[in-house]
């Protein structure tokens, strides 16, 4: 998709992929500069909503924004992923991280202060200069040669405090900065502490700054090993209830539960759950490079739709203003009537209500502008954006889909991502149907004496029991017939419609695997084949 994605783990360029990569990147940039940017500039979009996009915004790596109250483990989470300290890292139970830190790849380890960072054209942070020195003094880029950072960048944010001091003492609009990052990152991770769950008013306001970016949000319930299973259920329920009041979306947010640091678990009752949740989160993060172009395309479409709506609003206000007298009174009236104007424009141009900016914020911003200096509606600019949305985007989608098919599914490597991919600590290694794969003895043999006793109560004839008799025993597991049917096919190795004592023991073993919560294999692994049947089966490839 992007030039930095052109190398796989072995360091060799993918053949035939780079042309499509550059086409997608250049296509997105070209569409924005030729179609969307003129519309934004004509109606002061950048003053009301978001600064203009630059080349670095299209070419940068996928970014992850971490947000949470103080001491929820944001910085520790980054260290857990990288398995390495980074410049500017401070960890402790008190509010430690007081700055926004962009953790990015660099050939040498070091840090760049905010004022120098916003003048670097290769970094996607130039537009942050509008937040002033109060913010730039609390912003830095931490660079280090870490393999994880070759594929993604991570933004660490200051811990959110409670009280009025949180809002006043920073010297910059914290929520506006979060909103700026939210528009540009690929994933927003909200971290909560399971041991002291709380969503303060300040945190609620920060979450509301992510309005319109709901598809990027993931939730991590961290430090879950500090509570037992019963407490964890209560904490999870309280978290979902609290989030439901803050995030106005009908969809349920994905919550990952675990303990994301490289220390022993304090409570091991839910170890298997934590491992599965960590792998799910890793897979989500590893998918970001593959989906980066789609995300940027999606953000460009959302931006274009908002730019159109903004143009309709501004041009309507311009049209309603008198030429001579009563301008201030008319301005106040139009601002007051803005909700009605929204409804009118929705009907006139067949626009969804969800495409309109928030009324209250728009009213506050309009107070500072002279409506007579706004431009009238320019149909050609609107038509150019409509043509882009209708025709140009579809051709890019084809290129993106082709590139995604050629990319590896797990591009993020190194750090914690390598710790569970191979060897005995891979998720599910030696568990379920994989148990006994490394052992010489047949894994079913240890329980076979118990299964043999059952087998001989089922009236075997010539050393085998019929399907009818086997069914009587198998249905006692209360598993669905569809599952038992699959187990029968796997266990009946010679396909004679009957089970000998080894096949019956195998069937009971597979039932146990399913009852323990593991998935059944689609075909019988070689180590599960009964010893007396191994010669008759074809060797696995």
Curated annotation (Swiss-Prot):
Descriptive protein name: EH domain-containing protein 4
Job of this protein: ATP- and membrane-binding protein that probably controls membrane reorganization/tubulation upon ATP hydrolysis. Plays a role in early endosomal transport. During sprouting angiogenesis, in complex with PACSIN2 and MICALL1, forms recycling endosome-like tubular structure at asymmetric adherens junctions to control CDH5 trafficking.
Location of N-acetylmethionine modifications: 1
Domain-level remarks: The EH domain interacts with Asn-Pro-Phe (NPF) motifs of target proteins.
Residues the record lists as Phosphotyrosine modifications: 451
Domain of life per record: Eukaryota
Keywords: Acetylation, ATP-binding, Calcium, Cell junction, Cell membrane, Endosome, Membrane, Metal-binding, Nucleotide-binding, Phosphoprotein
Organismal lineage: Eukaryota, Metazoa, Chordata, Craniata, Vertebrata
């Amino acid at each position: 998709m992007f030039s930095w994605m052109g190398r796989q783990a072995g360091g060799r360029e993918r053949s035939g992929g780079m042309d499509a990569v550059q086409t997608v990147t250049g296509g997105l940039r070209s569409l924005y500069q030729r179609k969307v940017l003129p519309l934004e500039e004509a109606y002061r979009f950048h003053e009301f909503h978001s600064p203009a996009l630059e080349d670095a915004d299209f070419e940068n790596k996928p970014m992850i924004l971490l947000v949470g109250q103080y001491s929820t483990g944001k910085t520790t989470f980054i260290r857990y992923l990288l398995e390495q300290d980074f410049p500017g890292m401070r960890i402790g139970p008190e509010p430690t991280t007081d700055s926004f830190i962009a953790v990015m790849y660099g050939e040498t380890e070091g840090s760049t202060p905010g004022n120098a960072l916003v003048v670097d054209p290769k970094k996607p942070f130039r537009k942050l200069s509008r937040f002033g020195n109060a913010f730039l003094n609390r912003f830095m880029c931490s660079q280090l040669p870490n393999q994880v950072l070759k594929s993604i960048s991570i933004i660490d944010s200051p811990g959110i405090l409670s009280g009025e001091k949180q809002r006043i003492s920073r010297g910059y609009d914290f929520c506006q900065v979060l909103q700026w990052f939210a528009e540009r990152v690929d994933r927003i991770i909200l971290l909560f502490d399971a041991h002291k769950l709380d969503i303060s008013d300040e945190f609620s306001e920060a979450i509301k700054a992510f309005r319109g970016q709901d598809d990027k949000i993931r939730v991590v319930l961290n430090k879950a090993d500090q509570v037992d299973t019963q407490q964890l259920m209560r904490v999870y329920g309280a978290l979902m209830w609290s989030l439901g009041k803050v995030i106005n979306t009908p969809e349920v947010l994905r919550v990952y539960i675990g303990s994301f640091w490289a220390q022993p678990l304090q409570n091991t009752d839910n170890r298997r759950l934590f491992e599965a949740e960590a792998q799910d989160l890793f897979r989500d993060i590893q998918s970001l490079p593959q989906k980066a172009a789609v995300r940027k395309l999606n953000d460009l479409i959302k931006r274009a739709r908002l730019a159109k709506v903004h143009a309709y609003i501004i041009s309507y206000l311009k049209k309603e203003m008198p030429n001579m007298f009563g301008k201030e009174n008319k301005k106040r009236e139009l601002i007051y009537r803005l909700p009605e104007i929204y409804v009118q424009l929705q009907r006139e141009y067949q626009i969804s209500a969800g495409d309109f900016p928030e009324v209250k914020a728009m009213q506050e911003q309009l107070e500072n502008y002279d409506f007579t200096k706004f431009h009238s509606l320019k149909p050609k600019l609107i038509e150019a954006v409509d043509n882009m949305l209708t025709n140009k985007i579809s051709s890019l989608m084809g290129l993106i889909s082709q590139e995604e098919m050629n990319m590896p599914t797990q591009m993020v490597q190194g750090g914690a991502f390598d710790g569970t991919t191979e060897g005995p600590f891979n998720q599910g290694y030696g568990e379920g149907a994989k148990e006994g794969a490394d052992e010489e003895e047949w894994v079913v043999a240890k329980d076979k004496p118990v299964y043999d006793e059952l087998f001989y109560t089922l009236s075997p004839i010539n050393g085998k029991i019929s399907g009818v008799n086997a069914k009587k025993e198998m249905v006692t597991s209360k598993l669905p017939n569809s599952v038992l049917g699959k187990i029968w096919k796997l266990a009946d190795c010679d396909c004679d419609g009957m089970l000998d004592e080894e096949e019956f023991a195998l069937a009971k073993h597979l039932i146990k695997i399913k009852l323990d919560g593991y998935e059944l294999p689609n075909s019988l692994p070689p180590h599960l084949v009964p010893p007396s049947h191994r010669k008759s089966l074809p060797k696995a490839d």
